[in-house]
């Protein structure tokens, strides 16, 4: 019997590390990306038997910043995934505005990518700088225009809860709604004491204000025709993210790459977050069986 499967592929590299980011990400040294793609291909080949008994329904390339890959590296990655695409109904890649180009998006389209998740986060220049984002609002508009010409579904991310009394998040939302993406994700800013942002903020948003901000955002999104279908996700009808829903439904999802997590047949496991170990094929860091 064939089982359905979602595939997550982690590209951990970023041009610059955001001041709030606690994901598995790093700035690449010369050779890191090419070496990583080689290790990724070896890991993929190790799951041949799982792929033979599975129908892969969704592929999600996340990060990090997958759009940081140059054209040759992007082509190499997508060629790896090409044999797994035959039954895929949703193929997503994450991107940041500063690394979107027409040539890259054309390559995505040629390899079946039909959904792009774009990290905007805020349209306020001061907050972009505080968060360590390296794009501008002009770059967002340019990226959206390029993506729209070739890709069916666009998601844009927004962060709220930046500071007590802050109102810029609603301005950002209005700008996003004006771009009319099919999907919008809104995330509360999480401040970790070990990251640079913690030292840059004089005050933090309390839970009551965060709740109020979320509900303002939700109300405006609903009035603009977006339907909430998960905690942080809103879409126009028919554009709900299939891959996201696999996690909520605890459906089989294989994660490959640095720090990637998997859930297969009620067994959870995750890869090491240490690049040196991963390149040496010392991948699996933790396993556990989940009760049904």
Feature map (PLM): residue ranges:
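Local cysteine-cluster metal-coordination motifs and their immediate loop/turn environment
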Residues: 12-25
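Short active-site neighborhood of thiol/selenol oxidoreductases, capturing the structured segment around
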Residues: 7-10
């Amino acid at each position: 019997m064939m089982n359905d499967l979602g595939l997550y592929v982690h590209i951990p590299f970023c041009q610059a590390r955001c001041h709030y980011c606690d994901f598995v990400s790093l700035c690449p040294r010369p050779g890191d990306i090419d070496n990583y793609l080689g290790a990724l291909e070896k890991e993929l080949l190790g799951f041949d038997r799982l792929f033979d008994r599975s129908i892969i329904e969704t592929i999600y390339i996340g990060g990090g910043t997958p759009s940081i890959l140059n054209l040759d590296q992007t082509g190499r990655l997508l060629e790896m995934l090409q044999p797994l695409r035959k039954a895929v109904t949703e193929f997503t890649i994450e991107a940041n505005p500063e690394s979107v180009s027409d040539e890259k998006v054309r390559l995505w389209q040629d390899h079946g990518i039909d959904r792009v998740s774009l990290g905007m986060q805020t349209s306020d220049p001061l907050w972009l700088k505080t968060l360590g984002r390296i794009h501008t609002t002009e770059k967002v508009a340019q990226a959206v225009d390029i993506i729209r010409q070739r890709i069916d579904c666009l998601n844009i991310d927004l962060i709220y809860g930046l500071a007590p009394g802050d109102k810029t998040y609603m301005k950002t939302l209005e700008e996003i709604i004006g771009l009319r993406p099919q999907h919008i994700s809104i995330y509360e800013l999480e401040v970790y004491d070990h990251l640079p942002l913690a030292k840059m903020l004089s005050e933090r948003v309390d839970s009551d204000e965060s709740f109020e901000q979320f509900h303002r955002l939700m109300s405006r999104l609903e009035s603009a025709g977006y339907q909430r279908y998960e905690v942080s996700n809103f879409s126009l009808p028919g554009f709900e993210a299939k891959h996201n829903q696999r996690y909520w439904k605890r459906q089989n999802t294989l994660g490959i790459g640095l720090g990637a997590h998997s859930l297969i047949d009620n067994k959870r496991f995750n890869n090491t977050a240490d690049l040196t170990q991963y390149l040496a094929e010392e991948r699996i860091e933790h396993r556990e069986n989940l009760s049904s």
